[in-house]
Amino acid sequence: MDNKEVTLNDADVIEVKKNYFFDGLSCPVPVYLRLSQGHYLVIAKPNEKALFSSLNSFANAQSRVFVEKVHYDTFIRFVTSLTESMIGNETLPAVTKAKYVQGLSHHVIQLFENKKFSNEQQLTRVSSLVLKLSQSVSGFGEIEKILSALPNDDAKHSMATCFIAIMIAEEMEITQGQVFEKLSMACLLHDIGLHYIPNEFLKKPRHDWTPEEHAHYESHPIKGIEALRDLKEVTQDVLIMIVEHHENALGTGFPKKIRDVKISPLGRILIVANYFADLLFERVNGAQSYDAPLAIEFIENVLGQPFNKQVFRALKNIIILNEMKKRIDNAK
């Protein structure tokens, strides 16, 4: 293709990761490389195969790639779909898959940034840790196949839950690599049981569910461990966390309505991370979404803080420290 220069308003474009792109990729939207302020080079036209390796400027480590903001959602849906198909392709090398999972992680990072949760440097570090752990787990390819069967929103929710849980664990000074591995796996797999729940009522607002539909939904932690228990890579500790992820300290959760003292230590972290991710990202149909500080207030003032005190305190500390950092940065 002929690469031509165009003039664009810098406020109308958004940066995307270069590792999304490879020779022969046919992207559904135009892709640009920034030359200078307001000046861009078209490096991919919609639905045309691009040859990125032929561009010296693309190979430059300092070069940055953009799409127009109006096309960003379309681009991310395309990348997510491509990621899922790559994960299920056994002929592709792990390093290629990792690049795309990393791209999806970057999208989750941007969602977090918009919700005022932590900072990009910390989230990027957690993203790298999640990828490292997932690649180090024996047989993780089988787990990736299961994950790829989930809808995009559920996959993003699982990744977001994983990010939050690891940051909470670090705030609680939990440092053992094996613990992070188990926690990450449980977070990524905790909603596998939803795959066995009919979509008809999952798409409805929860206040419209019948008692039978509520009961069906509340069975999904059990269905999840039933689907996973034959995988030798999924340990008993991980299965316990998965079945506990909708419990709470008061004993009013599901499916077993157990109190805090009977919930596993890592299960307490997954429970808080899962609920907090739901509040941030409008995952529940008909529910309001919150930025991070307001989500903390909602848990305290509306729910009456029904979670383990130490875990919730760690989450709150992360939010408070991040807000303080932003105020200091803004005052400079």
PLM-predicted stretches and their roles:
Residues 212-213, 223-224, 281, 294-295:
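Phosphate/pyrophosphate-binding active-site loops
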Residues 84-218, 226-230, 237:
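Acidic/His-rich, divalent-metal-binding segments that scaffold phosphate/diphosphate chemistry
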Residues 183-187, 215, 228-271, 285-288, ...:
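Histidine/acidic-rich helix-loop-helix segments that form or flank divalent-metal centers
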Residues 39-42, 251, 278-281:
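Short small-residue beta-strand/loop micro-motif enriched in glycine and branched aliphatics
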